[in-house]
Regions:
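Hydrophobic membrane-insertion alpha-helices, especially the h-region
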Residues: 42-58
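Soluble "head" domains of membrane/secretory-pathway proteins
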Residues: 2-38, 57-58, 62-63, 71-217
């Protein structure tokens, strides 16, 4: 029987034939490097924009200046302030807040909220702060920094002891050395721009500032 021969050559029948398959064209090294640079630059710009937005609208790093909040906050410590919280939540007693000083709004102060709108604040004979006649828990105070509480309270103006609407009575934890509402009166709500949330420096004291149960040793 005669073998039928078909035209064409099959590659597996002839070792002398090399099949070259088309390959993807390699990108020029310069083009690849430029693309990488653009990608990194884009990511850096995005990160910078996000950082600016966070600082402007949400969280701001703040340096503590002074000793009025000892022992909870020491001079030169660094903290983060939440500037977003009070847009949606009420200011609560015991929170450490940052605000514009009413007598000079170019300066920022940091104190603890003691009296809320509508409350009457006073001090009992033992030197304990009372709200509407009831003593409040201030276990965050260090006794050695609260020796002259009664004496300093005697100088508080009577009209400051009733906290009117949209105002707050604030005090430093270092009661013997704090310039606060006892000396210059109430803080308008519109002047309070943030809550102290977290201490990030020094590292050995890093942590949340939310707790009011105990004073820091």
């Amino acid at each position: 029987m005669k073998q039928i021969t078909y035209p064409g050559i099959a590659p597996e029948d002839d070792a002398d034939i090399e099949i070259i398959y088309p390959e993807a064209e390699e990108a020029a090294p310069t083009a690849g490097l430029w693309s990488e640079i653009k990608s990194i630059t884009r990511d850096i710009i995005f990160a910078a924009v996000m950082a600016v937005l966070i600082v402007v609208f949400v969280v701001q790093p703040v340096k503590v200046e002074g000793t009025s909040m000892q022992p909870r906050l020491e001079n030169d410590e660094r903290i983060f302030v939440n500037k977003f919280k009070y847009n949606f939540e009420p200011i609560e007693r015991g929170e450490i807040v940052v605000f514009w000083f009413p007598d000079d709004p170019t300066k920022s102060f940091i104190k603890r909220v003691i009296g809320l709108p509508g409350e009457t604040i006073d001090m009992d004979p033992r030197g304990h702060i009372t709200i509407n006649g009831i003593p409040i828990d201030e276990s965050y105070l260090a006794p050695e920094r609260n020796q002259n509480a009664r004496e300093k309270w005697n100088s508080v103006r009577s009209d400051w002891k009733y906290v009117k609407a949209h105002y707050y009575f604030v005090m430093g934890d270092n009661r013997d050395a704090s310039n606060d509402s006892r000396s210059w009166g109430l803080v308008p709500e519109k002047y309070i721009y943030g809550k102290a949330m977290f201490r990030y420096w020094p590292l050995q004291r890093m942590g949340s500032l939310d707790s009011t149960s105990n004073y820091d040793e």
